[in-house]
Amino acid sequence: MTSSSPTGGGPGRPSALAPEIADRLKRSADGLLPAIAQQYDTGEVLMLGWMDDEALHRTLTTGRCTYWSRSRGEYWVKGDTSGHFQWVKSVALDCDADTVLVKVDQVGAACHTGTRTCFDTDVLLADQ
């Protein structure tokens, strides 16, 4: 599902995110936070997406990952198009409150290329 919020959507727009969470966030200049999706039971890093306050609110309240597409300028819910859902198990902020870690139960591929993870094809350094 892709959508804009009723107020036009996007970074810097009003959101229903709880003020006690929103006030702690350190966003980029464009109002976004990097959101790392990690498989909850194996620790496998799946992908990195971007969230604004509204995307984080939707993720926390629906139990499904919602991201902000910087290229399309709209929200997207992982799995609505591909069927490769991310069911949220936990959400945490890092120590600086500038990155979100979303532990998920990934159904199918996390990467738009069809692979399980976005980090498996261009390895720059690996143990010998």
Curated annotation (Swiss-Prot):
Cofactor(s) recorded in Swiss-Prot or TrEMBL: Mg(2+); Zn(2+)
Residues annotated as binding Zn(2+): C95, C111, C118
GO biological process: L-histidine biosynthetic process
Subcellular location: Cytoplasm
GO CC entries: cytoplasm
InterPro entries on file: PRA-CH (IPR026660), PRib_AMP_CycHydrolase_dom (IPR002496), PRib_AMP_CycHydrolase_sf (IPR038019)
Family statement drawn from the similarity comment of this UniProt entry: Belongs to the PRA-CH family.
NCBIfam families: PRK00051.1 (NF000768)
Protein name: Phosphoribosyl-AMP cyclohydrolase
